[in-house]
């Protein structure tokens, strides 16, 4: 290999390392800012049918920063949806303060009443900047917190705490299908086939979700789910169809 090619390759490696370092630094800065900045009071919102409103707490843990808070709801496909209204939709939040978002039902009973419906609650935190300190190289990062919002009809056929144990499984050569016969969304985590860890899955009510299955995966299926409070349920053994 010529010296010219060696130098080009070294230059490319140095550039790649620099870019990787910059991206890692930015990720650390964002993570630190998110931890010190704005936090939500829940990991999911359950909206019972017939309720006038549901509340979500928002806290600014950063004593020295003011944030502009913007909130909205999206449907399951990630498109803004007016069937739930968030108020206030936009407000300024000073350091060490807490505010409450009110989520209002504007669905007019048009959603299915035999199962849950999935939406996404979005809260964007935009940090304020001192204009006197701004330069051409200033990078302003807005952080969006996105959590599930479940619309839950009244009088569903099964209590929510019994749904996880009803999950069933169907295995093929290279995939595992999770079958949910209940009216609730099931967030499945710590899914294992023998000693192989499989990907997490969100299984819709009265529906299915499929995950990849390694060729050397064992036959014993175990899993846990996340309940209404964001906590893990006890480990369960999968029942095959």
Curated annotation (Swiss-Prot):
Residues 1-36 form the signal peptide. GO terms for molecular function: protein folding chaperone. Keywords: Chaperone, Fimbrium biogenesis, Immunoglobulin domain, Periplasm, Signal. The keyword Signal applies. It is found in: Periplasm. One of its GO terms (cellular component) is outer membrane-bounded periplasmic space. The keyword GTP-binding does not apply. It comes from the Bacteria. Gene3D superfamilies: Immunoglobulins. SUPFAM superfamilies: PapD-like, Periplasmic chaperone C-domain. InterPro entries: Ig-like_fold, PapD-like_sf, Periplasmic_pilus_chap, Pili_assmbl_chap_C_dom_sf, Pili_assmbl_chaperone_bac, Pili_assmbl_chaperone_C, Pili_assmbl_chaperone_CS, Pili_assmbl_chaperone_N. Belongs to the periplasmic pilus chaperone family. Required for the biogenesis of type 1 fimbriae. Binds and interact with FimH. This is Chaperone protein FimC. It comes from Escherichia coli (strain K12).
């Amino acid at each position: 290999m010529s010296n010219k090619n060696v130098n080009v390759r070294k230059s490319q490696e140095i550039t790649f390392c620099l870019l990787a370092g910059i991206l890692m630094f930015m990720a650390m800065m964002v993570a630190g800012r998110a931890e010190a900045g704005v936090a939500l009071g829940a990991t999911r919102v359950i909206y019972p049918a017939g309720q006038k409103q549901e509340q979500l707490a928002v806290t600014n843990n950063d004593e020295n920063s003011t944030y502009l808070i913007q909130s909205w709801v999206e449907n399951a496909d990630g498109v803004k949806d007016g069937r739930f209204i968030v108020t206030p939709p936009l407000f300024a939040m000073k350091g060490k303060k807490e505010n409450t978002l009110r989520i209002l039902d504007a669905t007019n009973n048009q959603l299915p009443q035999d199962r849950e419906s999935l939406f996404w609650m979005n809260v964007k935190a935009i940090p304020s900047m001192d204009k006197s300190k701004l330069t051409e190289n200033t990078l302003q990062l807005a952080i969006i917190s996105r959590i599930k919002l479940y619309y839950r009809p009244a009088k569903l056929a099964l209590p929510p705490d019994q749904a996880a144990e009803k999950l069933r499984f169907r295995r093929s050569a290279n995939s595992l299908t999770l079958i949910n016969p209940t009216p609730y969304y099931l967030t499945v985590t710590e899914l294992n086939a023998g000693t192989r860890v499989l990907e997490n899955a969100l299984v819709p009510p009265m529906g299915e979700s499929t995950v990849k299955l390694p060729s050397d995966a064992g036959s014993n299926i175990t899993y846990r789910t996340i309940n209404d409070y964001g906590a893990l349920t006890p480990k369960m053994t999968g029942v095959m169809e």
